[in-house]
UniProtKB/Swiss-Prot annotation:
Source organism of the structure: Mycobacterium phage L5
Compositionally biased intervals (Basic and acidic residues): 48-57
UniProt-listed Pfam families: DUF7302
Protein name: Gene 18 protein
Stretches for region Disordered: 33-57
Length: 57
């Protein structure tokens, strides 16, 4: 992710789009009700590969 320390990622409540703005501006936009702090992305669980059947002949 290309985030800077003094910037914050916010999400539009209208269309779900994202924007990265300064923390001060983000607070102002969130206060208007049109923007929110997005949820943190979930960690994806990796599935183990299925074992191949053992054919003993």
């Amino acid at each position: 992710m290309w985030s800077r320390k003094d910037h914050m990622r916010i999400q539009s409540t209208l269309n779900g789009g994202f924007a990265e703005v300064s923390e001060e501006f983000a607070k102002q936009l969130i206060a208007t009700g049109g923007w929110k702090v997005p949820r943190k992305p979930r960690n994806t669980k990796t599935k183990t590969a299925p074992e191949e059947p053992k054919n003993e002949e």
